């Protein structure tokens, strides 16, 4: 059974320009477990990301958290790109600092 991933992008703390924070990409509800998750800054892959261990929920779908340190400002755009067998093309979700 195939399940497409849900993707949520959020900062650990309320965003303040010039103040260091962590950006999180939480990917959940997917199956099979093979997945590629990348954090992007202005469309370019962020290299120094940390990834949680792949875990599964009671319904046997998987979830994963990818995060990186970042310092928000008005000019940079952050997003999360997810590739999975259920997606015809990678899913890109932008971070909204006002959420």
Curated annotation (Swiss-Prot):
Q: Where in the cell is it found?
A: Secreted
Please name the InterPro entries in this protein's record.
B2Microglobulin, Ig-like_dom, Ig-like_dom_sf, Ig-like_fold, Ig/MHC_CS, Ig_C1-set, MHC/Immunoglobulin
**Disulfide connectivity?**
25-80
Q: Which Pfam families match?
A: C1-set (PF07654)
Point out the signal peptide segment: none
Keyword list (alphabetical) reads: Disulfide bond, Immunity, Immunoglobulin domain, MHC I, Secreted
A GO biological process held by the record: immune response
Major localisation: secreted
Per the record, its GO cellular-component terms are: extracellular region; MHC class I protein complex
Residue ranges occupied by any Ig-like C1-type domain in the UniProt entry: 5-93
Checking Gene3D superfamilies in the record gives: Immunoglobulins
- Describe the task this protein carries out: Component of the class I major histocompatibility complex (MHC). Involved in the presentation of peptide antigens to the immune system.
Per the record, the similarity remark reads: Belongs to the beta-2-microglobulin family.
Assembly state and interactors? Heterodimer of an alpha chain and a beta chain. Beta-2-microglobulin is the beta-chain of major histocompatibility complex class I molecules.
Q: What is this protein called?
A: Beta-2-microglobulin
Name the gene.
Answer: B2M
């Amino acid at each position: 059974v195939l399940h497409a991933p849900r993707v949520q992008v959020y900062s650990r703390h309320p965003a303040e320009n010039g103040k260091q924070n962590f950006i999180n990409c939480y990917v959940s509800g997917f199956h099979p477990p093979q997945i590629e998750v990348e954090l992007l800054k202005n469309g370019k892959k962020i290299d120094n990301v940390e990834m949680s261990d792949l875990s599964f929920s009671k319904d046997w779908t998987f979830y994963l958290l990818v995060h990186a340190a970042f310092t928000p400002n008005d000019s940079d755009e952050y997003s999360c790109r997810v590739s999975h067998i259920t997606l015809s093309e990678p899913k890109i979700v932008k971070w909204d600092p006002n959420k």
